[in-house]
Structures are given as structure tokens and as C-alpha cells.
Amino acid sequence: MQLNPSEISDLIKAKIQNLAEGAEVRTKGTVISVTDGIVRIHGLADVMQGEMLEFPGNTFGLAMNLERDSVGAVVLGEYEHISEGDEVKCTGRILEVPVGPELVGRVVNALGQPIDGKGPINAQKSSPIEKIAPGVIARKSVSQPMQTGLKSIDSMVPVGRGQRELIIGDRQTGKTAVALDAIINQKGNGVICIYVAVGQKASSIANVVRKLEEHGAMGHTIIVAATASEAAALQFIAPYSGCAMGEYFRDIGEDALIVYDDLSKQAVAYRQISLLLRRPPGREAYPGDVFYLHSRLLERAARINEEEVEKLTGGAVKGKTGSLTALPIIETQAGDVSAFVPTNVISITDGQIFLETDLFNAGIRPAINAGISVSRVGGAAQTKVIKKLGGGIRLALAQYRELAAFAQFASDLDEATRKQLAHGEVVTELMKQKQFSTLSTAEMALTLWAVNKGSYEDVPVKKALAFEAEFLANVRANHADVLQAVNASGDLSADNEKVLAKAMESFKAGYSFN
């Protein structure tokens, strides 16, 4: 094709006229030093606290210390390729992670990137990891139950949707097991679960994923993993990333449950970053703002009202409340709940489930200490039938523990004390539950009803759990309609109670305790 000179000049003129002029204005700085993932930068006069910075090699960092003549930043990931003299650019953005239903069923890192080998996640939306928690006016009181499927928790320390309930205990006391049971129990309830693993071994996280897949719970779960081998910065931001993913569901009028496993390791990662940034250390060498680290995270778990959901969705969702329930986990050292981080988180949350090593080793699992475990707001959210039948459980256990201590010294006990001890022993036995064997509201109510009616008084303590399991199987087979009615209404009617009394009578008559 021949072009004459005048056509060439016309083409060039047209190109020049249509050129999109857009000079990029970005503040640049220079790396002064790199040590342990902390970068000191000269320049960047306009940088903001928490702003994302771009390093060479498509690496990003967070500006954390804004000083007179330098900026202290933490690198998100590998930093070996960054060296003195490298150029750093401000991005003008704060850190965002992908959010939405596309993440459900996937395992992602602290930045929301998939690490499960199942291909990319094509999320339509992203959200900043740091957000201000809903205000008082936007909230609604906690009044709907978040069933864990564990008898001891749902009867003594109930959790409501939008609550923050701390799970606290030494290592190897079953903290993660309680949280996983709560996640598995949400199957079919329409609750999206987020499990945030901070500072754990990659093998432990792989085991959690396998267990959730086995029990069909990965279909409603997102896993955010920041393993022990990853940078402290990623362990520090992982809970905030998980929270942003949960907030998406809360803000569209759905219910979500988030487990932070565990916040002790996040505090340690934050302490490491702060000390490397040369921030002044305080108690236990933690920085002064370690309380704020957890309070700004846990305050984002809330139940928001219909008006707020309508406002956040632009009127697309009407008449629905949304909730984000948090189960933070804290690991104690030798049962010391008065240490710095445990006391902080206890004061932030709406109650705690305290797990004890002695109970765990004695075979009482979940190893819940009924005396100091409380739920400050969950009582209002408890299912009617469980509230009615489970009221005496905590009292029976507390009295049993007290009397058992005295009974060691006293040889001759009166009849009333002996009865109380026997009752407490049976209740303690019945509160035991194997992992991954969660119960529905009706099945739980059945056990509590039988305890209240004194049906276990002539059952040997060692046989109580076997008797309970067989009676449940019998009712499931012959009176499934009663269980369905209790699950649907959340209450036990007088007629259904008569049916259960007859069922118990006939079952006991044909039951052999040998």
C-alpha cells in the first residue's frame, strides 16, 4: 500500500490531537536501609499512615512510621531483592483485599490471593482491610442464636449473632476444635464462615482444610492463612483481611462467623514489627497501642439494623439485618489469664469460654470451666427451649465442683449432698462431646430434658453417654416428628413432652446396663 507524504503528515497530526495527555504525579523516595522486612525511606513527603508503597519487582509495603526525615515501612512478603538506593513510589491507596461470594470455599493468603491451587479468584469487589466499626445508631441488639452444636456452650455460655465470644486456654486444650465445631454446625444455616489462621504451621492449616472438607463445611467457609513461615507483616494484617471479607456479607444483610486463630500470635507479630520500627516498648515489650490493635478489629463484629443494610446496599436489600459474629482465640501460658493480651481481649469481648488443661486431661472435653466462662449478651439470643431446660446446668456443675472438693475430706455425707454429687457427676459426664459430633437444637433439648426429669438418676455414670446416644437414635427413628417440631418452633410443647416421657419409659424398660 502506497502512502504519499501529505497523508503521512495528516496521520501524525491526527495521532497528536487524539493523544491522551496524563502526566503521572507520584511522590517518589529512596531506600536508605533494609533490615528484617523493615525499610527506611528518604523522601515521600506526602505519604500517609497505612498507605501502600510500591517497591521494585511488583512488591508492596505499608507506611507505618512517619518521621521528620524518613519513613519506616514494612514489606508485605519477600524483601531480599530490595536494596539501598532503590526507588519507592506512593500509590495513594490503602491496602485492599478482594471480597464477595467468589472467595467462599477457597484458601487465600493475607492479601486475598489464592494458595489452594484451584485457579484465580475473579472477585468483583474489593474492600479496605481497615474500616471504622459501625456506630451505635447503626447497630441492633444481639437477639438471634449462633448455635455451636456443643451442649456445654449452647446451654451455659450461649453465643448470639453479632457477638464477640473469646475462646481462651493453654495450648492443647481444644480451642481450635471448639471453633471448628461451630463452623461445621453452620452447614445449611446460611451463615458464611471465615477461619483466619495466624502463625500456625502450614501442616496444621492443611489439616483444618481437610477436616472441613470431610464434614462438608468448606462449601460455606473462607480460609485466610498467614503461616508461621510468612513475614510478620502478613501475620499482622491477616485478621483485618478476614474481617473485611466477613463485613461484605454483614453489610448485604447476611450472617457471617469469623474465627481468629489466634490473636496472641498476631500480637507477637505486631510486637516484632513495632520493635524493629524502634517504637517504645511497654508492658511485656508490647507497644503502647496493642489494645487498639485488637479493639479496632473486634469492634467490627456487630449486628447492624435494617436501615443500615438498606443504606449500604443502596436500597437493594430491605428489611434484613446483617451480622458478623467473632470467635477470637487467645493462648495463655500456664493458665495465666491476667497477662497483658488476655486481659485486653477479655475486656473487649462480650464474654469468654475458658478451657482448662486439668479438665482436658481428665477426659472432660470440651474442657470448659463453667465457673469463669460467661456470655454477657448471649442469654438474650438463646433458643427458648435451651434457655428453659438448660438453666440448672451451670448451677449443678458449680455446686458439684464445690461439693466434690469438700467430699474429699468428709467421710460421712448426708443424703442430700450425696444426691447432689451424683447429679453433678452425671451432668459433667453428659456435657462431654466428641469432636465433629455437633447436635441440633432438638437433640440437645432432649438430653437437657432427660436430665431435668431425673431420667439419669438410675443410670450408671460410666454408661450415661452410651445411654444418651442410644436414646437419641431411638427418638430419631421413632419420633422424628417431635425433633422436627422442636427445631422449627424452638420450644417443647406439653404434648411433645408427653410423647418423650412415654418414649423414655419404654426405652428404659428394654435397656440393659450390662
Curated annotation (Swiss-Prot):
GO molecular function, one term: ADP binding
Annotated Pfam families: ATP-synt_ab, ATP-synt_ab_C, ATP-synt_ab_N
Subcellular location: Cell inner membrane
InterPro entries: ATP_synth_asu-like_sf, ATP_synth_asu_C, ATP_synth_asu_C_sf, ATP_synth_F1_a_nt-bd_dom, ATP_synth_F1_asu, ATPase_a/bsu_AS, ATPase_F1/V1/A1_a/bsu_N, ATPase_F1/V1/A1_a/bsu_N_sf
CDD domains per the UniProt record, alphabetical: ATP-synt_F1_alpha_C (cd18113), ATP-synt_F1_alpha_N (cd18116), F1-ATPase_alpha_CD (cd01132)
EC numbers on record: 7.1.2.2
Catalyzed reactions: ATP + H2O + 4 H(+)(in) = ADP + phosphate + 5 H(+)(out)
This protein's UniProt keywords: ATP synthesis, ATP-binding, Cell inner membrane, Cell membrane, CF(1), Hydrogen ion transport, Ion transport, Membrane, Nucleotide-binding, Translocase, Transport
Quaternary state and interactors: F-type ATPases have 2 components, CF(1) - the catalytic core - and CF(0) - the membrane proton channel. CF(1) has five subunits: alpha(3), beta(3), gamma(1), delta(1), epsilon(1). CF(0) has three main subunits: a(1), b(2) and c(9-12). The alpha and beta chains form an alternating ring which encloses part of the gamma chain. CF(1) is attached to CF(0) by a central stalk formed by the gamma and epsilon chains, while a peripheral stalk is formed by the delta and b chains.
Family: Belongs to the ATPase alpha/beta chains family.
Function: Produces ATP from ADP in the presence of a proton gradient across the membrane. The alpha chain is a regulatory subunit.
Protein name: ATP synthase subunit alpha
